[in-house]
Amino acid sequence: MVIWITGLSGSGKTTLAVALHDLLKPNCKHAVLLDGDVIRAAFGAGLGYSEPERVIQIQRIQNFAKVLADQELIVIVAALYAHKDLLSWNRANLPGYFEVYLDASMALLEGRDQKNLYSKARSGETSDVVGFDIPWHTPDNPDMQINADAEADPIVVARQLIDIVPTLSGFLA
């Protein structure tokens, strides 16, 4: 099964993915976390942040997630770029696919802007920022949509996710 968590930078994707993984870990040794930033650091040498390069990055994560899920691992993905064609591919090809969309206001995102992406994009210091010069594609039909502005506790959201996904409910510590 693949749980795909998406949202803009700063929406809480990695935080939620880590919380979910940590809740499952004590009773589920076959849960794997794939974070987009970690995958890029490990396998993305020479890959930039333009829209075509972001597609390549997501396709790498998709392929990796499929290989792991085909071996009956529970794969938790935290990945930013959510182009509709890529999400459609996920739904058609990833076993047990469950999509989570973290919807966050720009005020929240800019408040959490650890990478200074949004401030640099506003000032013109950088380009290729999703939500500024690269369009953000809001997922059409996520299995779970979370208002990141309203729900601050990732453990609470991770527990809700476990309750919703029948495959996960037996693994809660």
Name each model-derived stretch.
Residues 111-159, 165-173:
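Small-molecule kinase domains that catalyze NTP-dependent phosphoryl transfer to phosphate-bearing small molecules
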Residues 5:
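Hydrophobic anchor at the beta1->P-loop junction of P-loop NTPases
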Residues 14:
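Walker A/P-loop
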Residues 17-63:
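Conserved substrate/cofactor phosphate-moiety recognition/catalytic segment
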Residues 11:
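ATP-binding Walker
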Residues 8:
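P-loop (Walker A) phosphate-binding loop of NTP-binding proteins
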Residues 2:
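Walker A (P-loop) ATP-phosphate-binding motif of ABC ATPase nucleotide-binding domains
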Residues 42, 50-98, 102, 118-121, ...:
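Glycine-rich phosphate-binding loop used to anchor ATP phosphates in small-molecule kinases
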